[in-house]
């Protein structure tokens, strides 16, 4: 089996099924800590339904957990641009930036995420 066939066969596997079936498959991969496989399924799903936050957020989380931090950051920025009060995306963006060593840039996102979640420091 040559490499081209293998790649085509692999791509077909990740794109197989309805959007709902692929969403379920991506969640199973993610729950099994198969983050790269989850991301492969989710890329196509996000392209198909770009307006939905759930698949894009799970894609960002899969990228984060598989150390694809620039990709995670890009997906998270799309989410917070569309929905500035999406606190979990803000939290993940802050953590992603921290993990890249960009602590100053992460700070505002982490503070905003905490405020949106109702986590206020005690005076």
List the predicted regions and their residue ranges.
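Long, contiguous interaction/recruitment modules in multidomain scaffold/adaptor proteins
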Residues: 1-18, 22
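Structural signature of tandem alpha-helical TPR/SEL1-like repeats
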Residues: 32-40, 66-78, 100-112
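TPR/TPR-like (Sel1-like) alpha-helical repeat modules
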Residues: 87, 91-121
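Alpha-helical segment of the N-proximal tetratricopeptide repeat
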Residues: 15-48
């Amino acid at each position: 089996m040559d490499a081209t066939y293998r790649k085509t066969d692999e791509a077909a596997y990740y794109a197989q099924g309805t959007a709902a079936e692929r969403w379920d498959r991506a969640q199973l991969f993610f729950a099994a800590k198969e983050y790269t496989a989850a991301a492969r399924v989710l890329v196509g799903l996000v392209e198909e339904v770009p307006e939905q936050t759930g698949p894009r957020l799970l894609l960002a989380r899969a990228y984060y957990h598989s150390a694809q931090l620039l990709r995670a950051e890009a997906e998270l920025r799309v989410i917070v641009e569309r929905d500035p009060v999406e606190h979990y995306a803000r939290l993940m963006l802050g953590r992603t930036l921290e993990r890249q060593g960009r602590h100053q840039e992460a700070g505002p996102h982490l503070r905003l995420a905490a405020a949106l979640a109702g986590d206020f420091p005690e005076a």
